[in-house]
């Protein structure tokens, strides 16, 4: 992947002029993956006592299968094919197969993985480092801040509030604008609520398909949050990714280099 400092070549655009930023929530502002890992590890031991004796590498593989949703069940939820609870149970079933759970314990226990797991994972919700500070700094420049997320608005509103983001009033869920990301509708709804032009609005997210491609199709400025993004001279500033035609940065702190833009 070719990444270039802003203005570093004829193909790299100058840093964008922007009036507002929309963020994805899960795995962009919230470290959901870590919370899912911790909650799965705790809950699977209640599903099957033998989990305590499984090879740690196998347990890690099963945990990642659940968190990364290797079966694509969350997408079926977003499209309306599954309920939220059904997609979670399907992900658990995949993970239990990976774990090698015996047949008599391989059916996910409904209440355990819905009510109980939900309580555990909420206890592990946390923002990525520097997130709260960077959001406050963006707001301090007078720019708008909002969220566009692929889960229902009420659930994500409660999540954001629990993370101390109740002041972020603009939150567009998968059910808010009539279609989920990557459809242009939720991005444009976010811009409308913020009162900003899409071409002067950043969209920061971790998904190339849902966040980057969706934002681009809606006319926003896409910024890909990618932990393995290269840094220019040790600085985690956003770099232009020529292959994907978007800006790319390792962590939210990279936005600080654009606060004066």
PLM regions: where:
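Short, acidic loop-to-helix structural element flanking the phosphoryl-transfer center
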Residues: 17, 81, 85-86, 106-108, ...
């Amino acid at each position: 992947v070719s990444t270039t400092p802003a203005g570093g070549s004829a193909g790299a655009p100058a840093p964008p002029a922007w009036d507002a930023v929309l963020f994805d929530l899960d795995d962009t502002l919230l470290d959901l993956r870590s919370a899912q890992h911790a909650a799965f590890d705790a809950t699977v031991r209640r599903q099957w006592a033998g989990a305590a004796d499984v090879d740690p590498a196998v347990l890690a593989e099963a945990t990642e299968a659940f968190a990364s949703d290797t079966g694509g069940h969350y997408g079926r939820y977003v499209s309306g094919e599954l309920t939220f609870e059904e997609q979670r149970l399907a992900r658990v079933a995949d993970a239990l197969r990976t774990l090698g759970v015996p047949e008599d314990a391989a059916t996910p226990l409904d209440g355990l993985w819905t009510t109980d797991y939900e309580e555990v994972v909420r206890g592990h919700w946390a923002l990525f480092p520097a997130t709260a500070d960077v959001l406050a700094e963006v707001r301090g420049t007078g720019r708008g801040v909002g969220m566009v997320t692929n889960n229902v608005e009420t659930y994500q509103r409660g999540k954001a509030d629990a993370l101390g983001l109740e002041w972020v009033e603009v939150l567009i869920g998968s059910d808010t604008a009539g279609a989920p990301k990557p459809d242009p509708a939720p991005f444009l709804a976010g811009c409308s609520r913020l009162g900003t032009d899409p071409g002067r609005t950043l969209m920061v997210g971790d998904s190339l398909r849902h966040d980057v491609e969706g934002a681009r199709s809606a006319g926003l400025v896409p910024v890909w949050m990618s932990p393995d993004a290269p840094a220019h001279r040790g600085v985690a500033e956003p770099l232009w990714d020529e292959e994907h035609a978007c800006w790319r940065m390792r962590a939210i702190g990279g936005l600080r280099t654009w606060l004066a833009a």
